[in-house]
Amino acid sequence: MKLLGLPLLLVLLAVTPPGCQGIIIPRCQLVRILRQHGLEGFVGERVADWVCLAKHESSYNTGAINRNKDGSSDYGIFQINSKYWCYNGRTPGASHGCRIHCSKLLDNNITDDIKCAKLIAQRARGLTPWVAWRNHCRGKDLRPYVKGC
């Protein structure tokens, strides 16, 4: 980064509203948080599955947003979709199953993200709604995701 670009970056970070920046949660911290929220064994999945899912959906970034071709968007560390689970005011045909505004899934507190992800997993009886989990985690040795934590 050029030296001239650093002050601009600092100014942009300073004017961004608190809670909207998102953070990268370190892997072992995420493991602890997920265990505290009862995800070990929830719908038959291990915490390692949830950590793998978060790694491949958002790279552990609580502020991640992905825009989809159908006009919906995916939000937060678990990339929760606006068509089915959260309200963003723009997605056509949305059902808002978690009854939460999508912006709440972008802050540094992932308690509401976990609550919504648990609802999704409970309704699906597993993690199959997440493409990244199906493609990168299902049926694989996921011990490295929790090793040392």
Q: Residues of each region from the PLM?
A:
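Export/targeting segments at the very N-terminus of extracytoplasmic proteins
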Residues: 2-61
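Catalytic and binding regions of secreted/periplasmic enzymes and modules that target cell-wall glycans
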Residues: 23, 67-149
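A near-ubiquitous, low-amplitude feature marking generic local secondary-structure context
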Residues: 33-37, 63, 93, 99-100
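Conserved helix-loop-beta core of C-type lectin(-like) domains
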Residues: 47-55, 60-81
